[in-house]
UniProtKB/Swiss-Prot annotation:
It is a multi-pass membrane protein. Belongs to the G-protein coupled receptor 1 family. Glycans are attached at residues 15, 172. GO terms for cellular component: axon; cilium; plasma membrane. Its main location: membrane. This is Lysophosphatidic acid receptor 3. It comes from Mus musculus. A lipid is attached at residue 309 (S-palmitoyl cysteine). It comes from the Eukaryota. It is found in: Cell membrane. Residues 315-354 are annotated as: Disordered. Keywords: Cell membrane, G-protein coupled receptor, Glycoprotein, Lipoprotein, Membrane, Palmitate, Receptor, Transducer, Transmembrane, Transmembrane helix. SMART domains: 7TM_GPCR_Srsx (SM01381).
């Protein structure tokens, strides 16, 4: 019967996997990785919070697609949290961690990836439902969208917890991987292959939908300009989604390939030398998504810009002396109109700075 090592610290497993964490995380490389990672995380928290707030405040975004887009932003926000936790529990500190704390560290990263991937799959279903009917938005109810979002997070949390639940190498040291010293190589193979397979499926689905919409758009009569403009609207959303999917595949595939090579026990692949740079590349995906949303969607860009504008103006107003009562009274007369605009179009900034 194999001996289990639940009470060991991580230095026991790192030493057996010949992973010298202390030497790798010193000097210039450590400073670069931590500085870039910190900047990425701050931007992730700020930009993805803006995306979520934009969807909440702007009625134009109160549709299934944008609710799912906000959930993808929430997954990116969670990825930032996971990376912050990683930065405080990595390098020389890694060897001092308990098994449970290391499981938590890695589980957060696995959960963030699964949440993003599952959310993209749900968006693919939503886009398929709407575009096959040549509609901008699907007829999913808010209740169904909420259930789908809950399902995404339930799957993500479960997948992140699978190694903790038993699929690990604590009782079979010879099966341990190198990059994840208490993950069994069989689990790494399963996890990476399933994710890569999901990538290929999503790419195939989106390419099929894209070609379908393009074919339908090209056969429309040139005399029905109104119909053309309505039918091209789904294509705009599709281009946004495909750009997001492309960025996701580019940023995550190298890291997954490295994990797969480690799972296959490739001794000559030198996976230890590239793992942190590929992790930064994966984190870059959460940085890129809000930029893609705002660049591809003019309404999203305008809403986010107005929110920043309003926040800056509110900050400046607090530093200024109060205005005279007549000015305040004249502004209050238009208050209801501003309120109405803010509900229908998102935050409204007053150009006069009041």
């Amino acid at each position: 019967m194999n001996e289990c090592h639940y009470d060991k610290r991580m230095d026991f497993f790192y030493n057996r996997s010949n992973t010298d964490t202390a030497d790798e995380w010193t000097g210039t490389k450590l400073v670069i990785v931590l500085c870039v990672g910190t900047f990425f995380c701050l931007f992730i928290f700020f930009s993805n919070s803006l995306v979520i707030a934009a969807v909440i405040t702007n009625r134009k975004f109160h549709f299934p697609f944008y609710y799912l887009l906000a959930n993808l932003a929430a997954a990116d926000f969670f990825a930032g949290i996971a990376y912050v936790f990683l930065m405080f529990n990595t390098g020389p500190v890694s060897k001092t961690l308990t098994v449970n704390r290391w499981f938590l560290r890695q589980g957060l990263l696995d959960t963030s990836l699964t949440a993003s991937l599952a959310n993209l799959l749900v968006i693919a279903v939503e886009r398929h439902m709407s575009i096959m009917r040549m509609r901008v938005h699907s007829n999913l109810t808010k209740k169904r969208v909420t259930l789908l979002i809950l399902l995404v997070w339930a799957i993500a949390i479960f997948m992140g917890a699978v190694p903790t639940l038993g699929w690990n190498c604590l009782c079979n040291i010879s099966a341990c991987s190198s990059l994840a010293p208490i993950y069994s190589r069989s689990y790494l193979i399963f996890w990476t292959v399933s994710n890569l397979l999901a990538f290929f499926i999503m790419v195939a689905v989106y390419v099929r939908i894209y070609m379908y919409v393009k074919r339908k758009t090209n056969v429309l009569s040139p005399h029905t300009s109104g119909s053309i403009s309505r039918r091209r609207a789904p294509m705009k959303l599709m281009k946004t989604v495909m750009t997001v999917l492309g960025a996701f595949v580019v940023c995550w595939t190298p890291g997954l390939v490295v994990l797969l090579l480690d799972g296959l026990n490739c001794k000559q692949c030198n996976v230890q030398h590239v793992k942190r740079w590929f992790l930064l590349l994966a984190l870059l995906n959460s940085v890129m998504n809000p930029i893609i949303y705002s660049y591809k969607d003019e309404d999203m860009y305008n809403t986010m810009r107005k929110m920043i504008c309003c926040a800056l103006q509110d900050s400046n107003t607090e530093r200024r002396p109060s205005r005279n009562p007549s000015t305040i009274h004249s502004r209050s007369e238009t208050g209801s109109q501003y309120l109405e605009d803010s509900i229908s179009q998102g935050p409204v900034c007053n150009k006069n700075g009041s």
